[in-house]
């Protein structure tokens, strides 16, 4: 566990602080570093628990400190190819991420959930199912969901279960991380500003199963080309789910029913309208994945179904906010890539006024615009990508576009545009 080694933690966000705390508990010599010139060493020190012995450096890292480092822990937001990391890698310094560091302290079993979209909903639902079966004190929900693995790993025991939402950024820096159940919900273009190529992004997602064996399970989406292809190469035993195709082995949707099939023998598990509070086909897929994961952990279907029936939308994910003046307001602000945003539009059943925009992740918007298909009444755009999105929309013949500089202005425009029979979804 890096005891006695001089460890550099790069990044002073919540993941970096968690890593520094865990390293100190395990008697490493810690340097907490942030390259921001807007911070000082004292700012970093203030983020750590009182009594921390970690050295804290902001701005430029002194060469003598860099050359003394024996291991480096990267926060998820730190690219693996920055000059500092490249220099240390060339010197043979051990490079790992917060997830790998947490796993080194893990004592129990791990479930790891990744995918372009649906991670948080599936992870949250899976966590609730595990709590219901194994107990709240034996279940830890960690990772990209906002709770660093490193803050929970040393609380685990041989009979505990850790459920992790793992991003592609976090998967770039794993080496021994070994979940007993993994899941890749889907893979569509995203974060290409970080990964540069689709091939690199896919490889990062597939890494979640890299240390698994056939004794382990990997839950995969049959309807997604990338994950279906991986089923044939996966080192774990693949378990498939589909919302479009009936499967001889796996979980699938037939009409309103989720069915489990084992060698063609079918078992009806639930009704998506009577037993689910979530909206949208994307959430049916998330529920199927959670069922597959839970059954892989030997949780009885009765327990699974009880939790699903009481489960509501995760904040910011096709989340119903309110009805005001006859207009339904939905918050889908976690739909931060075109495919996720498409799912939000599909979930709407009436004409929609849509807010879009944000920072540029080098995404293509053609399929998103095509998904409007008469449902989107008007598009209100904001942020760095608004002109790029508007140009794409006009190319596809959609010209009902308005611009806003603030979210307050967005909401005012949407309210003006909406009518009593219409919905608005914010993303």
Describe these PLM feature segments.
Residues 1-97, 101:
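N-terminal leader/targeting and accessory segments in enzymes
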Residues 3-6, 18-26, 273-377:
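Nucleotide phosphate-binding/pyrophosphate-handling subdomain across enzymes
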Residues 6, 22-25, 63-67, 76-222, ...:
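Phosphate-binding loop of NTP-binding sites
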Residues 13-14, 79, 117-121, 284, ...:
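Residue-level detector of alpha-helix initiation sites
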Residues 29-36, 218-222, 355-356, 375-384:
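Short internal beta-strands
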Residues 34, 58-60, 96-100, 142, ...:
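Beta-strand->loop->alpha-helix junctions that form or flank phosphate-binding loops
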Residues 42-54, 366-420:
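C-terminal helical cap/extension that packs against the catalytic core
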Residues 422-425:
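Conserved small/polar residues in nucleotide/adenosyl-binding loops
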């Amino acid at each position: 566990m890096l005891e006695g080694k001089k460890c550099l933690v790069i990044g002073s966000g919540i993941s970096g602080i968690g890593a520094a705390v865990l390293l100190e508990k395990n008697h490493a010599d810690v340097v907490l570093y942030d390259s921001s010139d807007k911070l000082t060493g004292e700012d970093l020190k203030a983020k750590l628990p009182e009594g921390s012995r970690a050295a804290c450096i902001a701005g430029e890292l002194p060469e003598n400190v860099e050359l003394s480092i024996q291991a480096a822990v990267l926060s998820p937001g730190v690219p693996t190819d920055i000059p500092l990391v490249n220099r240390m890698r060339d010197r043979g310094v051990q490079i790992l991420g917060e997830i790998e560091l947490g796993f080194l302290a893990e004592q129990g079993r791990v479930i790891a959930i990744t995918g372009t979209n649906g991670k948080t909903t599936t992870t949250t639902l899976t966590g609730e199912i595990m709590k219901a079966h194994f107990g709240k004190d034996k279940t830890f929900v960690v990772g990209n969901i906002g709770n660093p693995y490193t803050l929970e790993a040393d609380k685990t025991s041989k009979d505990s279960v850790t459920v992790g939402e793992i991003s592609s950024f976090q998967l770039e820096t794993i080496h021994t991380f070994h979940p007993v159940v993994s899941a890749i919900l889907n893979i569509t273009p995203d974060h290409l500003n970080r990964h540069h190529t689709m091939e690199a992004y896919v490889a990062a997602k597939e890494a979640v199963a890299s240390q698994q064996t056939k004794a382990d399970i990997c839950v995969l989406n049959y309807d997604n080309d990338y994950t279906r292809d991986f089923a044939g190469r996966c080192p774990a035993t693949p378990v498939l789910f589909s919302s479009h195709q009936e499967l001889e082995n796996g979980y699938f949707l037939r009409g309103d029913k989720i069915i489990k099939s084992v060698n063609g023998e079918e078992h009806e598990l639930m009704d998506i309208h009577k037993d689910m509070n979530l909206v949208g086909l994307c959430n049916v897929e998330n529920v199927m994945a959670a069922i597959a994961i839970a059954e892989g952990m030997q949780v009885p279907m009765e327990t699974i179904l009880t939790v699903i029936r009481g489960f509501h939308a995760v904040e910011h994910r096709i989340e119903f906010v309110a009805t005001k003046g006859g207009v339904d307001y939905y918050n889908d602000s976690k739909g931060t890539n075109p495919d996720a945003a498409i799912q939000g539009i599909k979930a709407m059943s009436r004409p929609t006024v849509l807010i879009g925009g944000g920072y540029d992740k080098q995404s293509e918007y053609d399929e998103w615009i095509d998904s409007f298909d008469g449902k989107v009444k008007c598009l209100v755009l904001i942020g760095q990508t608004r002109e790029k999105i508007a140009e794409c929309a006009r190319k596809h013949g959609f010209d009902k576009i308005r611009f806003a500089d603030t979210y307050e202005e967005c909401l005012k425009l949407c309210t003006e545009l909406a009518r009593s029979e219409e919905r608005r979804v914010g993303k």
